[in-house]
Amino acid sequence: MLGVTTYLTTDVAPFPLFWVLPLALYLATFILVFARRPVYAPPWMGRVLCLPALVLMVSFIIEATHPPAVFVALHLLMFGAAALICHSELAKDRPASEHLTEFYLWMSVGGVLGGMFNALLAPLLFKQVLEYPLVMLMACAFAPRVGEQRGFNRGDILWPAALGLLTLALVLAVQAAGSEPGRASTLAIFAVPALLTYRFVLRPIRFSLCLAAILAASATYVGAHGRTLLVERNFFGVVRVTQDVNGRFHQLVHGGTLHGRQHLDPARTGEPLAFYHRTGPAGDAFRLFNTVAASLPPRVGLIGLGVGALATYAKPEQAWDFYEIDPAVERIACDPRLFTFMSQCAASRLRVVLGDARLKLRDAPDGHYGMLVLDAFSSDSIPVHLLTREALRLYCAKVADGGLLAFHVSNRRLDLKPIVASLAADAKLAGCDREDFDITADERRDGKEISEWIVLSRRADLIHQLARDPRWQPLPPASGPLWTDDFSNLLMALRWK
């Protein structure tokens, strides 16, 4: 349960309320098998478990999570079947009434140990969320056996070995071509061994071992984000540094979300890419700031570090403060072997402040910054407390009169523009928005990504300067309830299409 909950709420559909669904399935299956008239897993339940497990194992390897609704349904179907099967085995082994107390005690101890493993040991043992696919394999091994397909024979060793070698050969053959694998070739690499594995669905041990062999062979697979150079896992999730297949960029990926990239060409390492491209809204916002910088404090605050790409906009006379909550991100961004934006920054003073931005920002004097950039909302799981009325009041207090607030609101799952528009209207701030969604194929190959930024200010004339560019549009009228420290509703921000 903890494994599927962690994976669902970090990689597939990062939405806090989704933890309720696996818990509900867990409790429902527990109630069914321990009821007065128990409902045990029927023999065909093994097929219900193994088919989605097969699809999900392949999706785990190739990092496929779209469309989210389909994958959420598959994960819940697999977990529900696994929970019913495992709870059925527990219920069938239930002892006589005089030993029930001990039975339930040890069952609870097992739950505690499993929770401790997931929470404490798994992040130390695994760089990825591997505890989930490993438990998935174990659940498939416990699936009910049907007919005469029982026992263990040499086929249970030879077939997994053969499928593992086949997968490895397919991976190496595609990568030897030297180009980024397309959807068809990626699917073929793992779909062929997976289809061969399904013929063993009536032999749970062999089926699980074949899946395990495919998973092991996939370690050499270069995924959608390229070759992995570094992986770190902590309380905040899994961050990876990758090099794209064509060897042009280093990239920072958190879960399944890109957080920045840098050219490896020494002549172009100083170019901001991805969501921070000079031809995008980030470039427009900093050009506007530089036109009025003489009348503002020469200090810029940024909430969210990423790879430090925004540091390329710094001027020698300026001081820049990055507020970052994840120490792993700070180590990666400041390591010149991975990214050099920070070491090349032209600012007279560059500082990274570790900790929660709202708490740390309180220590800055009022009116301290000429510009404050909020770049903490591109992940699928956003820090809601940075997007409330009280948070905006804090930002306004720390920015000088006439200064700028820039919100990076690019997000695959959430439409944050109406939320920011309501906050701006409540604070009586002028603002406009640019959706940079129509980028060319050449721009994408050159490292640019689609992005959306919102700029706010007390000075309406500055916003009017931006709005002279027709790509910058006024914010929509305030609608819906205002987010505060006491109220927020992610459902109203979800992109349902």
Residue ranges, per PLM feature:
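Alpha-helical transmembrane segments of multi-pass membrane proteins
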Residues: M1-Q473, A478, S488-K497
